[in-house]
Every structure is written in C-alpha cells, then in structure tokens.
C-alpha cells in the first residue's frame, strides 16, 4: 500500500490552514540527505500503469484487452480519490474504450492526464507526448504555463530549460546536448513530443 500524498490528507486544512503557499521551512522541505520523509508522494499509480498498457495494446505494441485495462485504469483513478464509478459513467462514451484507434488513444491520454492532475510534470509530459487533451494546449491562459519568462509569447512550453548549476557542474555535456537538441529555450521542440 502506498502512502497518501499530503494533498489527499484529510488534515490538509490543519496543515496549511487554508493556504497553499508557504515559505520553505523544514516542515515543507528537507535539506539534501537530511531527515526523513515529510510528504511522501505517489510516483506512479496503478491507474497510470493500466492506461499505459491500454495505450500499448491499441498501438499494437502489446497484446491483450485494451478496453479492460482502460476500465481498470478508470476504476483505480477514481478509487484513489474516493469516488466510485457509477453504471451511468461506466457505460458512457468516455467510460468505454470504443471508436477508431486515434479516438481510443485520445480517451486513454485524456484519462491519464486527469489522473495525474496532482503531478504537473507528468501531466505536461502526457500532453507533449500524445497531443491530448488538445484543450490543454489550445485553451490555457495560465501565465505559469504560457509566459514562462515571456519567451513563449503565449505558446505552450515545449521543454524545460537546463538548470543554471548544470552549466557550471556539467558544461561539456550540456553544450553537447544543446548542440544535438537545439537551443536551451522553452520553445525548442523535443524529438519525442507530438505537439
């Protein structure tokens, strides 16, 4: 059994007193290699693994029951948040894996994205890798996503920049990577990204 994220804790209000921002203190962060776990988090859920298996089956990379893995992924995702799947949802258009292969991939990616909403980097990578949900790319006006130091001019960030300490501690490899991948800016398209 995994430990629940602090965001899922029933004590969240008492921990943060209704505020979701605080200055870094030992209650929020640990110095490197000091102390124990403070806020354990989920790295990958059972839902995510079932959605990825369903995707692999639809793409022909694996064999099995894509619809079954999709349904199991939905169940795990909803159970994680304490929500039961109703018969109405289970039989709905979004609750079943039907349609063309592209429509199936869109449904799977969208559900993976929803299931990862507390894991922003993973959700961002899902959109970058699959192009779904398309609305995440075309309708977001969140300045944290869109402006990113003003260099994006309203576009969706294609990649994250290397941290400045990497240039001092690993300059040769960073320069080689930039030569292969393109400029170290958020607008540089990544080889693996669909969008």
Please describe what each predicted stretch is.
Residues 4-195:
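Acidic/polar-rich alpha-helix caps and helix-coil junctions
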Residues 1:
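Active-site loops and adjacent core secondary-structure elements that bind or stabilize anionic groups
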């Amino acid at each position: 059994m995994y430990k629940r994220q602090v965001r899922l804790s029933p004590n969240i209000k008492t921990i943060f007193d209704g505020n979701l921002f605080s200055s870094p203190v030992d209650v929020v962060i640990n110095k490197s290699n000091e102390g124990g776990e403070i806020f354990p988090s989920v790295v990958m859920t059972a839902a995510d693994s079932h959605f990825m298996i369903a995707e692999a089956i639809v793409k022909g990379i694996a064999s099995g029951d894509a619809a079954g893995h999709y349904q199991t992924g939905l169940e795990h995702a909803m159970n994680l948040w304490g929500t039961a799947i109703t018969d109405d949802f289970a039989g709905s258009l979004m609750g079943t894996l039907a349609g063309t292969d592209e429509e199936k991939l869109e449904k799977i990616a969208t559900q993976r994205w929803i299931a990862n909403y507390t894991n922003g980097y993973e959700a961002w990578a899902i959109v970058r890798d699959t192009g779904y949900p398309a609305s995440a790319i075309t309708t977001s006006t969140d300045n944290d996503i869109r402006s990113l130091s003003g260099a994006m001019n309203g576009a969706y960030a294609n990649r994250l920049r290397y941290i400045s300490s990497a240039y001092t501690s690993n300059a040769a490899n960073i320069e080689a990577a930039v030569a292969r991948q393109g400029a170290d800016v958020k607008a540089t398209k990544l080889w693996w990204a669909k969008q």
